[in-house]
C-alpha cells in the first residue's frame, strides 16, 4: 500500500472490478501502487510544437480582411451576389475548406449544411441559413468528436439592418480565421478522434447556426465530448487603450445548463458546482496549452458566458455537450455591433485596423494545443461513480473501461474542496475499480484515462452509486 509522505489516510488500495464484464481487467497489486503525483501543466510534445509553429498570423490577417471586404455578412443580406453579402462570404469559406481538405488524403470532408429557418426573433421571414462544416475523421476513435467554431455572420448597430456595411472583423471574422487556420494545419495530420471545424451563421440573430449544428449531432446521437467557440478573439486592446496581448479568456459554466431536477438534487447533496463537464474541459485546456509554446495565458472564467450575454457554445450546453467560449481579455464596444462612422474624431465600427493579428494567431495556438491533445489522448471515462453502499472513511470508485486501442490504464485525481484545480493523481493501472484511503467528505475525486504514450484525457467527475 502506498502512503503519501506526511499525509494520513491516503493509502491507495486497488482491485479488479466486481462485474463479470470487468473481470478480465488487470488487477493492480496494492504493494506496487505508486506515490501520488503533484499535478503540473504538461509540456507539449515535439509533434505539437511543430504544429503550433505552422500557425501563421499573416494568413489569419488575410482571412479577416477578406471577410470584412464582403461589406456585410448579415444573415438577412444577399445570398446570391458574388461580391457582397453573406452568400459571397459563405462560398469563399467553403472554397477554403475544400482547398484544405485536399491535403488530408481523404480524411477531411466538407459539407454545406443549409436549411430554411422559420420566422422568429430577428428573422422576419423564412430565411436560408448555411453552416460550412469540415470534418477530419479520426483514425482510432472516429466516433469521439470535438468541435471548434466561429460565426461568419455580422451586424451593424441595428440588428435588423442587413444593408449597411458591417465588416465584423473582430466579431467574428477573427473566430472564423482561427477555425480556418486550424483546419489548414490539422488537415494533413492523422488524429485519433474526429475534429470538426465549423463556420456557422445566424449567431447575431439568435444562435441559429450553432443550434442547428448541435441538434444535428444530437439527432445522430453523436459522442461530442467537447466544443469550443471562438467569438471576438481579434483584439488585445481594451476601450481605455490598455493592452493584454498574452491572455485569452475561456468561459466555462459550473452548474450544467442541461441539469435535470434529479441531477440538481444529487449535486446539492454531494457538491460538484465547480465540476461540470465544461469545467473539466477548461481545466484540460489550461493543462495542455503551455504558455511557453502558445504565447498565451488561458484565464478560465467561471461563468457560462459574459454577463447577461450568450454565444454559440450555449446550444451545445443545452444539449448536454461540454463546451466553452474563447473571447479576448477586454472588449472595446466602439468596435463591436456599431455602424461604421466617425463621431467627434473617433472611429466606430468593427474594422480590421483594430485587430491584433499576432494575438489571434496565439489564440489559434491555444485552440490547436487543446484540440490536438484531446484528439490524441483517450476520451473522458464513462460511468464514473463513488460507491456509497456502506459508510466508510475510504472512497471506492468504479468506472467503465474505454475502447481506445492504445489505452494503458487510469489515474484517480483529487483536490481539496476549496482548490480550483486538480492537485494530486495516482496511476491505478488498467482496472475499473479502486479504493483510496481518503474520505469523500473532505476532497473531490475524479478519474481520467491514460494511453501508452502517456497522454491523459479529461477528468470525469463521479456521481454517487447507491
Language-model regions: role of each:
Residues 1-7, 16-25, 32:
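N-terminal secretory signal peptides
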Residues 59-137:
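A non-catalytic alpha/beta surface segment that caps or lines the substrate-entry region
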Residues 68, 233-251, 300-378:
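Active-site-adjacent mobile loop/cap segments within catalytic or ligand-binding domains
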Residues 148, 154, 159-207, 367:
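Alpha-helical metal-binding/catalytic segments enriched in His/Glu/Asp
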Residues 200-311, 319:
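Metal-dependent peptidase/peptidase-like ectodomains
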Residues 393-405:
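Conserved aromatic anchor
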Residues 437-455:
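Beta-strand-rich modules
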Residues 452-466:
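Extracellular fibronectin type III
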Amino acid at each position: 500500500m502506498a502512503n503519501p509522505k506526511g499525509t494520513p489516510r491516503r493509502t491507495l488500495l486497488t482491485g479488479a472490478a466486481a462485474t463479470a464484464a470487468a473481470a478480465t481487467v488487470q488487477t493492480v497489486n496494492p504493494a506496487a501502487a505508486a506515490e501520488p503525483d503533484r499535478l503540473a501543466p504538461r509540456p507539449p510534445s515535439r509533434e505539437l510544437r511543430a504544429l503550433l509553429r505552422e500557425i501563421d498570423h499573416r494568413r489569419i490577417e488575410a482571412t479577416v480582411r477578406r471577410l470584412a471586404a464582403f461589406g456585410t455578412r448579415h444573415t438577412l443580406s444577399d445570398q446570391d451576389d458574388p461580391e457582397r453579402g453573406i452568400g459571397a462570404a459563405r462560398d469563399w469559406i467553403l472554397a477554403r475548406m475544400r482547398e484544405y481538405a485536399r491535403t488530408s488524403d481523404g480524411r477531411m470532408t466538407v459539407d454545406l449544411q443549409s436549411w430554411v429557418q422559420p420566422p422568429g426573433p430577428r428573422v422576419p421571414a423564412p430565411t436560408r441559413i448555411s453552416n460550412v462544416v469540415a470534418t477530419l475523421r479520426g483514425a482510432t476513435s472516429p466516433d469521439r468528436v470535438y468541435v471548434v467554431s466561429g460565426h461568419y455572420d455580422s451586424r451593424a448597430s441595428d440588428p435588423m439592418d442587413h444593408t449597411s456595411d458591417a465588416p465584423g472583423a473582430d466579431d467574428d471574422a477573427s473566430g472564423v480565421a482561427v477555425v480556418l487556420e486550424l483546419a489548414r494545419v490539422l488537415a494533413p495530420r492523422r488524429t485519433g478522434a474526429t475534429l470538426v471545424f465549423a463556420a456557422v451563421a445566424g449567431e447575431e440573430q439568435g444562435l441559429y447556426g450553432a443550434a442547428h449544428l448541435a441538434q444535428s449531432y444530437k439527432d445522430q446521437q453523436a459522442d461530442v465530448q467537447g466544443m469550443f467557440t471562438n467569438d471576438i478573439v481579434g483584439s488585445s486592446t481594451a476601450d481605455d487603450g490598455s493592452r493584454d496581448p498574452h491572455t485569452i479568456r475561456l468561459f466555462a459554466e459550473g452548474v450544467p445548463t442541461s441539469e435535470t431536477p434529479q441531477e440538481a438534487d444529487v449535486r446539492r447533496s454531494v457538491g460538484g458546482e465547480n465540476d461540470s463537464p465544461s469545467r473539466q474541459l477548461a481545466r484540460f485546456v489550461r493543462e495542455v496549452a503551455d504558455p511557453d509554446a502558445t504565447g498565451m495565458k488561458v484565464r478560465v472564467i467561471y461563468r457560462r458566458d459574459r454577463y447577461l450575454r450568450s454565444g454559440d457554445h450555449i446550444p451545445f450546453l443545452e444539449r448536454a455537450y461540454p463546451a466553452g467560449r474563447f473571447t479576448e481579455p477586454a472588449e472595446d464596444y466602439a468596435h463591436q455591433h456599431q455602424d461604421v462612422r466617425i463621431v467627434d474624431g473617433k472611429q466606430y465600427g468593427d474594422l480590421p485596423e483594430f485587430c491584433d493579428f499576432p494575438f489571434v494567431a496565439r489564440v489559434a495556438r491555444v485552440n490547436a494545443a487543446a484540440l490536438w491533445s484531446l484528439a490524441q489522448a483517450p476520451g473522458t471515462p464513462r460511468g464514473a461513480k463513488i460507491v456509497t453502499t456502506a459508510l466508510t472513511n475510504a472512497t471506492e470508485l468504479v468506472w467503465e473501461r474505454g475502447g481506445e486501442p492504445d489505452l494503458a490504464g487510469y489515474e484517480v485525481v483529487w483536490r481539496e474542496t476549496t482548490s480550483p484545480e486538480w492537485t494530486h493523481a495516482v496511476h491505478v493501472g488498467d482496472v475499473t475499480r479502486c479504493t483510496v484511503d481518503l474520505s469523500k467528505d473532505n476532497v473531490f475525486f475524479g478519474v481520467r484515462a491514460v494511453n501508452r504514450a502517456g497522454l491523459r484525457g479529461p477528468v470525469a467527475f463521479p456521481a454517487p452509486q447507491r
